[in-house]
A protein has these predicted regions:
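Membrane-interface helix-boundary motifs at transmembrane edges
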Residues: 2-6, 71-81, 143-154
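Functionally critical transmembrane alpha-helices in membrane proteins and complexes, commonly lining
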Residues: 7-70, 86-94
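C-terminal TM-helix exit segments that contain a strictly Trp-centered aromatic cap at the helix terminus
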Residues: 23-27, 96-105, 165
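Transmembrane helix-loop junctions in multipass membrane proteins, especially transporters and channels
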Residues: 32, 36, 75, 102-110, ...
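Transmembrane alpha-helical segments and their boundary/interface "anchor" motifs
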Residues: 43, 50-59, 70-101, 108, ...
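Hydrophobic transmembrane alpha-helices
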Residues: 62, 66-70, 136, 140-144, ...
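Aromatic-enriched alpha-helical transmembrane segments of multi-pass intramembrane proteins
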Residues: 119-121, 145-166
Length: 166
């Protein structure tokens, strides 16, 4: 992929952002179907929208894959920098949420407790996406090699497996 922005990826990114926003609207959006009478058209429309917005995370991951997997011969240092940035964000924000838990009396301070919960992803549930993205970045060199050497038959086989087992 060249450095020029791909318009279709930007459109998909906008769609994914809108889906994430809808997913976080609570009773004013995502859970609106629960305020409708089951079996009515409005119930099914809002239910469909709520289910459809769950497509946002796989869409973001697909966009990341399209952008990052296609880059040939990218230096390992570049990927290490990406990983480092995500780890820093994860450590800093997790520490802030850990301090909040201490302030609220939910736990007492312990470096060991902080590190164990940071590694386990138990400090703040809404940071889960950073763990997912971090796993993607760590796997990126392997995934890139697989993607670059995948022929059409193996790609079709992989898609069939994904559809059947998901």
């Amino acid at each position: 992929m060249n450095t020029k922005k791909e318009v279709y990826l930007e459109i998909l990114r906008i769609i994914a952002i809108c889906l994430v926003i809808f997913n976080h609207t609570g009773l004013n959006g995502y859970w609106l179907f629960t305020q409708r009478t089951p079996g009515t058209l409005s119930f099914y429309i809002y239910l469909f929208l709520s289910l459809f917005c769950k497509f946002a995370v796989p869409l973001f991951m697909a966009i990341s894959g399209a952008v990052l997997l296609g880059r040939k011969d990218e230096p390992v240092k570049k990927n290490a920098q990406r990983i480092f940035r995500i780890v820093i964000v994860l450590v800093v924000y997790s520490f802030i949420y850990y301090l909040q838990s201490i302030y609220l009396g939910e736990c007492t301070f312990s470096w060991k407790d902080y590190v164990v919960n940071l590694i386990a992803g138990n400090i703040s549930a809404h940071l889960w996406y950073l763990y997912l993205y971090l796993a993607f970045l760590i796997s990126l060199p392997i995934l890139r090699r697989l993607a670059q050497n995948l022929d059409d038959k193996l790609f079709a086989y992989m898609i069939i497996l994904a559809v059947v087992f998901n």
